């Protein structure tokens, strides 16, 4: 039996200026900056995460650099227990690329057969941290 996914977590979008993009999404779609995740935006390579008014849709705004081809990735969400099951499942399938501690969340990364990037993220940080030690 496959582990359960809760839904999409966030969509990566490359932009030239994260602040200007966040303002545009606010003005056009009502998205606001997710204050609890702004620590990631302190790093030039990290995302500025914004969300819709209901907190259901998250966009991770990444700064596009030079001739870089924009990154497209789908990030799914799972609770802590299911996240660990997915980690084991992907490892068994030999497609788990890495498991990353983001200090407020955990993510696992893998690619499909065509090289498209995928991620599963959980915000049950304390639970997963305790299980991975």
Where does each model-flagged region fall?
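Residue-level structural signal for beta-strand termini and adjacent loop
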Residues: 39, 64, 121-123
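N-terminal beta-strand motif that seeds the catalytic metal site of vicinal oxygen chelate
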Residues: 1-20, 73-74, 128-133
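Conserved beta-strand in the GNAT
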Residues: 58-62, 119
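Core segments of cupin and vicinal oxygen chelate
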Residues: 12-57
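Vicinal oxygen chelate
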Residues: 1-4, 8-16, 48-53, 64-133, ...
């Amino acid at each position: 039996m496959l582990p359960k996914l809760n839904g999409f977590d966030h969509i990566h979008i490359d932009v030239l200026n994260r602040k200007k993009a966040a303002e545009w999404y606010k003005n056009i779609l009502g998205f606001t900056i997710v204050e609890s995740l702004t620590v990631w935006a302190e790093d030039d390579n990290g995302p500025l995460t914004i969300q819709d008014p209901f907190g259901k849709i998250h966009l991770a705004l990444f700064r596009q650099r030079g001739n870089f081809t924009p990154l497209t990735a789908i990030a799914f969400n799972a609770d802590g227990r299911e996240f660990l099951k997915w980690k084991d499942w992907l490892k068994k399938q030999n497609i788990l690329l890495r498991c990353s501690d983001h200090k407020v969340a955990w993510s696992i990364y893998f690619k499909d057969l065509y090289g498209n990037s995928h991620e599963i993220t959980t915000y049950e940080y304390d639970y997963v941290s305790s299980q991975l030690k």
